[in-house]
Amino acid sequence: AAGLYWVLTSGNSNDGGIGLNSIPSNTGDKLSSGKSYYVYASEIELYPTNNEGKAWDTGDGGPDIKYHIKWLGNEIFESTVKDNSLLANWSGLQIDLKWSDLLGKTISPNEAIQAARLRYDDKGFIEIIIEDSDVAKDDAAGNLTMDLKTLRIGKNEQGYAKDTQNSVRRTVVTVLPIDSTIEDLAQFMRE
């Protein structure tokens, strides 16, 4: 486990190639037709009240934010829930280990990377469905549609106006090439 942590958090600044470490936020390269990408919401901020202008939960608790990504009409990813927060963050990396796992378990990149996987098409789009996760019934916070041609490699920040259908103030959607090295992915995802 310690070795995996070192691999995921160590950067290699002398690799001589074009690593993801050098891509600043909001200014990455355009996506390439036919190429596959990881896509996830690295940050979601909600307005202080729900779509009806009321408190998210009873008492003074904030919303329990989760999101789903749909592509080609199919749900391809569901996030973990971030409890009692108006501003939720996801790193794109998650490793759930038990003490028994520390004895020789290997983790594949597909297990560690928590993101949607899709192939770019300039006519394609994704839907991000954001909810307040509740025990009885999840409350809608917003359904956002993003044209893939508007996304860039790296972090893509977008703000939204509040109305009766939307309580999402802002999203940061991160897009990374699937063929990146695990070291580059880990470095970029932890930022």
Task: Name each region found by the language model.
Residues 54-66, 81-83, 91, 98-103, ...:
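C2 and C2-like phospholipid-binding beta-sandwich domains
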Residues 44, 72-74, 131-133:
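Solvent-exposed coil/turn segments that connect beta secondary-structure elements
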Residues 63-75:
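Extended low-complexity, serine/threonine- and proline-enriched intrinsically disordered segments
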Residues 20-23, 31, 181, 185-191:
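Activation corresponds to long, low-complexity, non-globular regions
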Residues 3-19:
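Hydrophobic single-pass membrane-insertion segments
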Residues 20-66:
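C2/C2-like lipid-binding beta-sandwich modules
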Residues 74-85:
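Surface-exposed beta-strand/loop patches in noncatalytic accessory domains
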Residues 72-75, 118-124:
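A short, structured loop/turn motif at beta-sheet edges
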